[in-house]
């Protein structure tokens, strides 16, 4: 593979990662399809995907840096409030409660989960995740019990964490699982999305660090330019995607995302079967 060709592939996959990582559409499903079409598969490809996820994580840190510092007791200016008056304040305990279920299951069944990374499982996960998004829109309370991020209870945070376990199924979408769970628990669409992004930072950093440790042997110095392009592209595109997504969900429901998931599932079937 020539240098220019590999850099082009890195840029394309960086765009795909940045666009889909935090949308409820499954970045895994998209990366599998695009990687297959580009002929970029195997151990190096898997390591590359792990590295560029760090770019997406960095985008969340940049977007929510004030809120993240606030979780550890460092505040800049007035406390942040979004989408409704605050009755309390989101704390690090909320994040920890949202992490525990998936962390426990992820550590216990890490190898089993990795064995599920194949097109057929991803295809089914895309469909089931789409159905969950539709269920969340149809069954959510008419008036959210937690209109703002700071209105969330510990119970809601923990239940969102339980829904996050669904994302251990490759192709399900971590953001889709957590946002749907939040809405079903009475958290507003916007606040559930914000919490999903905040929860992504420790969850994805932990999972990425573990995957990177296990994949370290596949890295070579020759891969650095390609990985750097993918990382930077994913970071920039994820920044734009997050900003756009948070504005978009104020105006539309998640039904279009569910329909899109069904289309991607059909694409997986066409490409691989």
Curated annotation (Swiss-Prot):
Bilayer topology annotation: Multi-pass membrane protein
Source species: Escherichia coli O1:K1 / APEC
Cellular localisation: Cell inner membrane
InterPro entries the record matches: UppP
Statement: the UniProt record of this protein carries the keyword Cell inner membrane: yes
Role, per record: Catalyzes the dephosphorylation of undecaprenyl diphosphate (UPP). Confers resistance to bacitracin.
Main location per the UniProt record: membrane
Entry-linked HAMAP family: Undec_diphosphatase (MF_01006)
Gene assigned in the entry: uppP
A GO cellular component annotation in the UniProt record: plasma membrane
NCBIfam families per record: PRK00281.1-1 (NF001388), PRK00281.1-2 (NF001389), PRK00281.1-4 (NF001390), undec_PP_bacA (TIGR00753)
Source domain of life: Bacteria
Catalytic activity: di-trans,octa-cis-undecaprenyl diphosphate + H2O = di-trans,octa-cis-undecaprenyl phosphate + phosphate + H(+)
A GO molecular function held by the record: undecaprenyl-diphosphatase activity
Protein's name in the database: Undecaprenyl-diphosphatase
Keyword Cell membrane: yes
Alphabetized PANTHER family for the sequence: UNDECAPRENYL-DIPHOSPHATASE
